[in-house]
Amino acid sequence: MELAELNDRGLVLVGCGRMGGALLKGWLARGLAPEAVRVIDPNAPAWLAERGVATEGPLPDDPAVLVLAVKPQMMGGVLTERAAAGQGDTLVLSVAAGVTLAAYERAFPDAAIVRAMPNTPAAIGQGISAIVGNARAGAAEMALAETLMAAV
């Protein structure tokens, strides 16, 4: 799946710090429409509004992807708050270190889940990432996760 194909269902990004921001900039540069993105971050950077990325308002009903890009110590609260967004056909993609697939599966019991571990240069678009999926993450979900992580 190409990033432009996500424009119909949307992408929700929870956390837009260094890594989340680097990912989003890469996705936008590769064809993801700003209006297809909804960022959830209490300290959303100003450049989001400048590029037309929403930080307020309702979430898409059935986003194609829910990306979790918060620090591991914040993940417990995020999983509780965002469990409804990771249902149906939504791919849950996490770039947080130290949180197991089992923890994500408790929050999103029916979801395809992929954990990605980008290295530090990914924050400036020069990195590589390792990815691993749960049993529900088939070839299509893994390919989508790989496409998303290739942006950095």
What function would you assign to each model-found segment?
Residues 1-57, 61:
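NAD(P)+-binding Rossmann beta1-loop-alpha1 motif at the extreme N-terminus of oxidoreductases
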Residues 40, 115-130:
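Active-site capping/gating segments
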Residues 18, 74-75, 99:
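Residue-level detector of alpha-helix initiation sites
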Residues 43, 47, 57-86, 91:
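Rossmann-like NAD(P)-binding element
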Residues 90-94, 104-120:
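Rossmann-fold dehydrogenase core element
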Residues 5-7, 31-32, 82-88, 107-108:
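Short, conserved loop/helix-junction motifs that constitute active-site signature segments
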Residues 85, 103-112, 128-152:
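Internal alpha-helical scaffold of NAD(P)-dependent oxidoreductase catalytic cores
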